[in-house]
């Protein structure tokens, strides 16, 4: 039996804490591809694509034939070669594509039906993916193709859990961007999961046993969702103020309630307690003819409940807004830069160390451990996105009816919308500076310096998703958050498919040297500064509009003696 929204709100801290842990262990684990790749090679996936040259024996590691022949090596008794790398990288491309692209239909479904069913489906798909990899490892020569299906289900299931967890911050009010960043930080840190599994694997535990146990743990996610997540979507702070201490059962609708339903119910009750219908209807007609709002309490509730259609932009209007379009450019460039590095990291390291597999394995483990930085760094962007918003909220909550002299002496407060845009501009500018720094370190063929590249890669990956999520939550209606985030993820995932031809170009014509690919990606990453530059211009536009409104209010006050333009006389 699914709990009510009121029950879910009481359990919000438990749900948030478990969601962070579940994201860490079961969401975007494919981001730890470097460690999984080593284990798949050691288990013989697509090893049959490699042919052993005559001058290579079983004891040779990294042995090469004559210059005209392909380089091969042995890993745990299985052959490893370039053809195997290309096929497994293609499987990673498919899985990482679904990890992002599936968010559009997920967002549409979640906005309409809520996160519960999607989270149940995601945990089940993740468990099936683990079992498929384990089954493929039992007969790799015949069942290697299962890795494509398994990684596809892994990406789909992981994104279901990640995406549904992004609705939980709606229950935390002004801290919503911070909690979104925390969820995204745990999602980004899930890249540490496969390095952790690799440590268990290196300790001698069977690969199949590890995956079966992991699939069983995914069942716990299913049970947690079944008993704690409600059927209805979580209403945003603008739709429901959870801080109001009221028992919904007093009003008779504790079972299913959203912000709009609450106001509708209160309006209905208000009508019954109001003045006679004949008196109210006459005033309504006069007000509608003259274009004014009514001050009657019951009608005022209804009037204030209806402007959502006028205030909230349509979905298509949001899609073609400059902020969304420029955020797509930023995400496409950043996603391609990050995904290419994750997919090609082992080969890049192998090029730097001339094929030393032990050193490659060591640096891959270091990269995996550093993914935990996302849990610490991602909330920083969320904090930047929430910077001083509480002061703006306090300003809007002050009583409106004050003397003119008191109004002039009152301390000037920040405009909430302008503060949101300012925070987003700072977040994206800082993130893109780090992305450019990451591109510069990738150009330097120095092995110890790659640790700095690992750190910058991890920080940027956590920052960019947190910044985009916080921007969408701040600028667009909560009912469009899932669809817009899904659209952004789909387009950036399609663009990130270019990482496969870039990988083939690096391994083929460039003979494993990533220099020119990194140069091109560095130049492309400069496009990410378009969004913060536009946000600067947009902020100035909002400031001019605010100044004009303030001047109009002063003029109205001077003429009428009151700043209330909604009074009906």
UniProtKB/Swiss-Prot annotation:
Glycosylated. Dephosphorylation at Ser-274 and phosphorylation at Ser-297 increase affinity and amino acid transport activity. Phosphorylation-dephosphorylation cycle is regulated by food-entrained diurnal rhythm and dietary proteins. GO terms for cellular component: basolateral plasma membrane; plasma membrane. Coiled coil: none annotated. The modification Phosphoserine is found at residues 274, 278, 297. CDD domains: MFS. Glycans are attached at residues 55, 58, 560. InterPro entries: MFS, MFS_trans_sf. Residues 395-416 are annotated as: Disordered. One of its GO terms (biological process) is amino acid transport. Changing residue 274 to A: Increases affinity for phenylalanine. Increases phenylalanine transport activity. Strongly decreases glycosylation. Strongly decreases expression. Increases membrane localization. The keyword Membrane applies. The chain crosses the membrane at residues 20-40, 90-110, 120-140, 143-163, 177-197, 203-223, 323-345, 365-385, 435-455, 462-482, 490-510, 516-536. Pfam families: MFS_1. It is a multi-pass membrane protein. It is found in: Cell membrane; Basolateral cell membrane. Detected in several tissues with higher expression in placenta, kidney and peripheral blood leukocytes. In the kidney, is detected in epithelial cells of the distal tubule and collecting duct. In the intestine, is expressed mainly in crypt cells of the intestinal microvilli and epithelial cells in the base of the villus. It catalyses: L-leucine(in) = L-leucine(out); L-isoleucine(in) = L-isoleucine(out); L-methionine(in) = L-methionine(out); L-phenylalanine(in) = L-phenylalanine(out). One of its GO terms (molecular function) is L-leucine transmembrane transporter activity. Uniporter that mediates the transport of the stereospecific L-phenylalanine, L-methionine and L-branched-chain amino acids, between the extracellular space and the cytoplasm and may control the transepithelial (re)absorption of neutral amino acid in kidney and small intestine. The transport activity is mediated through facilitated diffusion and is sodium ions-, chloride ions- and pH-independent. This is Large neutral amino acids transporter small subunit 4. It comes from Homo sapiens. The gene is SLC43A2.
């Amino acid at each position: 039996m699914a709990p009510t929204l009121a029950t879910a709100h009481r359990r919000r801290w438990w749900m948030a804490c478990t969601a962070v842990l579940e994201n860490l262990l079961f969401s975007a684990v494919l981001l730890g591809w470097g460690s999984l790749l080593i284990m798949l090679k050691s288990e013989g996936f697509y090893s049959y694509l490699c042919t052993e040259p005559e001058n290579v024996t079983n004891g040779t590691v990294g042995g090469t034939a004559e210059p005209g022949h392909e380089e091969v090596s042995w890993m745990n008794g299985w052959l490893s070669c370039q053809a195997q790398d290309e096929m497994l990288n293609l499987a990673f491309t498919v899985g990482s594509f679904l990890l992002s692209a599936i968010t559009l239909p997920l967002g549409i479904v979640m906005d309409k039906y809520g996160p519960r069913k999607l989270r149940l489906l995601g945990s089940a798909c993740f468990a099936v993916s683990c079992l498929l990899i384990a089954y493929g490892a039992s007969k790799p020569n015949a069942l290697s193709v299962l890795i494509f299906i398994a990684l596809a289900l892994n990406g789909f299931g992981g994104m279901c859990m990640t995406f549904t967890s992004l609705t939980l911050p709606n229950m935390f009010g002004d801290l919503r961007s911070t909690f979104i960043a925390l969820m995204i930080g745990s999602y980004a840190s899930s890249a540490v999961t496969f390095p952790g599994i690799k440590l268990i694997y290196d300790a001698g535990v069977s690969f199949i046993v590890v995956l079966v146990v992991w699939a069983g743990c995914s069942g716990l996610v299913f049970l947690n969702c079944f008993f704690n997540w409600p059927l209805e979507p979580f209403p945003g702070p603008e739709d429901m103020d959870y801080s109001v201490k009221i028992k919904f059962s007093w009003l008779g609708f504790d079972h299913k309630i959203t912000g709009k339903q609450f106001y509708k119910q209160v309006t209905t009750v208000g009508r019954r307690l109001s003045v006679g219908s004949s008196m109210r209807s006459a005033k309504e007609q006069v007000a509608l003819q003259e274009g004014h709002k009514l001050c009657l309490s019951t009608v005022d509730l209804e009037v204030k409940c209806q402007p959502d259609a006028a205030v909230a932009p349509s979905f298509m209007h949001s899609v073609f807004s400059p902020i969304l379009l420029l955020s797509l450019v930023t995400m496409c460039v950043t996603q391609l830069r990050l995904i290419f590095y994750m997919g090609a990291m082992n080969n890049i390291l192998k090029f730097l160390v001339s094929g030393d597999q032990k050193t490659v394995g060591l640096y891959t483990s270091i990269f995996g451990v550093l993914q935990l930085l996302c849990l610490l760094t991602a909330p920083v962007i969320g904090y930047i996105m929430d910077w001083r918003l509480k002061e703006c909220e306090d300003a809007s909550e002050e009583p409106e009816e004050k003397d003119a002299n008191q109004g002039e002496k009152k301390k000037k407060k920040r405009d909430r919308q302008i503060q949101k845009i300012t925070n987003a501009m700072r977040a994206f500018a800082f993130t893109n500076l780090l992305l450019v720094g990451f591109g510069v370190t990738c150009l330097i063929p120095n092995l110890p310096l790659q640790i700095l590249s690992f750190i910058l890669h991890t920080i940027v990956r956590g920052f960019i998703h947190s910044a985009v999520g916080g921007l969408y939550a701040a600028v667009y209606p909560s009912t469009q958050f899932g669809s817009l985030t899904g659209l952004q993820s789909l387009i950036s995932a399609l663009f990130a498919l270019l990482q496969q031809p870039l990988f083939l170009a690096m391994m083929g014509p460039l003979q494993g040297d990533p220099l020119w690919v990194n140069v091109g990606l560095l130049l492309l990453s400069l496009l990410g500064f378009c969004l913060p530059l536009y946000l600067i211009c947009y902020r100035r536009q909002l400031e001019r509009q605010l100044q004009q409104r303030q001047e109009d209010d002063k003029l109205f006050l001077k003429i009428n003696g009151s700043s209330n333009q909604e009074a009906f006389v």
